[in-house]
Amino acid sequence: GKQVVLKQIHHEPCDYYSFGNKIEAERRDYERLRGAGIRIPEMIAIDTEAEQVVKEYIEGPTIFEMIRDGASAETYLPQAREMADRAKAAGLNIDYFPTNFVARDGLIWYVDYECNDYMDEWSFGNWGIRYWSRTPEFEAYLKEHSGGKQESAE
């Protein structure tokens, strides 16, 4: 059988952002990403009532895990830049944070379906690249999300 991921939409209060209909946004973003030629997992099913999405599971480490564990993401940068170029050509930004990218068989997959209208400030070159190696930003994120101790993959 095929392994899948079940994503349950949750609603958290957020002062600075209005999400609108999140399940419809998920479907719309999936179509926009496919149209832009971004490598994403297949959406297998969507249940608008239960606000659930079933998508293909992409096995492999995230780019974040690789960097955290001492590996380099260098070999994946050309693919990330190609995705960024495709997204920009379609008028989109994707979330370039390295937890959203899984490496499998030499390819990276964008495993989140989130995308937004393109803004240069949030492009890969201006924002995302800052987290694709052991930069001060990456180290600050690690420290902030691990209580100062080494983060574990579990």
Annotated model-derived regions:
Residues S18-A36:
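The N-lobe alphaC helix and its flanking beta3-alphaC-beta4 segment of protein kinase-like domains
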Residues K88-I94, R104-E154:
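C-lobe/activation-segment region of protein kinase-like
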Residues P13, T62, Y118-D120:
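Conserved protein kinase catalytic core
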Residues V4, R39, V53, W109-D112:
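Protein kinase-like catalytic core scaffold
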Residues G1-K2, E56-Y57, R104:
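Active-site beta-strand termini and strand-to-loop segments that position acidic
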Residues G1-E24:
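ATP-binding glycine-rich loop module of kinase domains
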Residues F19-G20, I38-L77:
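Conserved structural core of kinase catalytic domains
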Residues A73-F101, G106:
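Conserved kinase catalytic-core segment
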